[in-house]
From Swiss-Prot:
GO terms for biological process: ribosomal small subunit assembly. Residues 16-23 are annotated as: G1. InterPro entries: G_ERA_dom, GTP-bd, GTPase_Era-like, KH_dom-like_a/b, KH_dom_type_2, KH_sf_prok-type, P-loop_NTPase, Small_GTP-bd. An essential GTPase that binds both GDP and GTP, with rapid nucleotide exchange. Plays a role in 16S rRNA processing and 30S ribosomal subunit biogenesis and possibly also in cell cycle regulation and energy metabolism. It is a peripheral membrane protein. Pfam families: KH_2 (PF07650), MMR_HSR1 (PF01926). Residues 8-176 form the Era-type G domain. This is GTPase Era. One of its GO terms (cellular component) is cytosol.
């Protein structure tokens, strides 16, 4: 700490509807892949911390599941509760919206963030895709009218446009505090959790429209032996048909899933990785609160 630059540290919640670019934003800010992404809604299921320390400032980002209307299964209720809980006890809230459309789920998030009493920034994403920037002005003005106390900033999470300005604005709002985490720590999540998420990401990207949402991944073994990290991952589905989809014809799809996940793991863990995948049917797990707790989904 210097006289001109007090040490600042605080929590920053990133909220918004599903598939609006929250995890992409976090990854770009951190400068590395931490949160999984795909084009499918509800990719993020858990709140996860992404920690960025730069000089005197430590910003602790809370990446959240997309707030959505579906509340019929225990898993949906868990994700919505996690996202709403992130609005409490944070120092700054980033409400991510897509400049191309406004949905009922955006409105749902707006109705929740309007009660935020601390600093609120509306990050209008995907503005790099606009040919005429003047077309954006009415949308920015409308957002400002909806949340008069918020700061509205156009960004591109994918391209990194205006993220330096966003981070500077966040830093201004963080309280003067000693840093809560070591300078080199980037998340609160375990390596096993990150490995499971990478496998789930590759499943979501491989399956596309065939994707059964009732999929989760459990790491059964995570062991470093010499220069090789051995990881055994169990993919849980709810029906036999889902198992067949993931395995694919002659096992080709699950081989691709494993190959792509392994490559990302080797970068993340800086080690050669031996990855083994299995698929198991566990009927009804996504609506079974006891099963969800045993799979690490916390309080329901």
């Amino acid at each position: 700490m210097t006289d001109n630059n007090p040490t600042r540290c605080g929590y920053v919640a990133i909220v918004g509807r599903p598939n609006v670019g929250k995890s992409t934003l976090l990854n770009h800010i951190l400068g590395q892949k931490l949160a999984i992404t795909s084009r499918k809604p509800q990719t993020t299921r858990h709140n996860m911390l992404g920690i960025k320390t730069e000089g005197d400032v430590q910003a602790i980002y809370v990446d959240t599941p997309g707030m959505h209307k579906a509340n019929d299964k225990a898993l949906n209720r868990y994700m919505n509760r996690n996202a709403s809980a992130a609005l409490k006890d944070v120092d700054v809230v980033i409400f991510v919206v897509d400049r191309t459309k406004w949905t009922d789920e955006d409105q749902l998030v707006l109705e929740r963030v309007q009660y935020v009493t601390g600093p609120l920034i509306i990050a209008v994403n995907k503005t790099d895709r606009m040919e005429e920037k003047a077309e954006l002005i009415p949308h920015l003005q409308w957002l400002q009218e909806q949340l008069p106390n918020a700061e509205v900033m156009p960004i591109s999470a994918q391209q990194g446009h205006n993220l330096d300005a966003l981070e500077a604005q966040i830093a201004k709002h963080l309280p003067e505090n000693d840093h809560f985490f070591p300078e080199d720590q980037i998340t609160d999540r375990s390596s096993r959790f990150l490995a499971a998420e990478l496998v789930r990401e590759k499943i979501m990207r491989q399956l596309g429209a065939e994707l059964p949402y009732q999929i989760t991944v459990e790491i059964e073994e995570f062991k470093q032996q010499g220069h090789v990290l051995h990881i055994h991952a169990l993919i849980l589905v709810e029906r036999d048909g889902q198992k067949k989809i993931i395995i694919g014809d002659k096992g080709e799809r699950i081989k691709r899933i494993g190959s792509e996940a392994r490559k990302d793991m080797e970068v993340l863990f800086d080690s050669k990785v031996m990855l083994n995948l299995w698929v198991k049917v566990k009927g009804g797990w996504s609506d079974d609160e006891r099963a969800l707790r045993s799979l690490g989904y916390g309080d329901l």
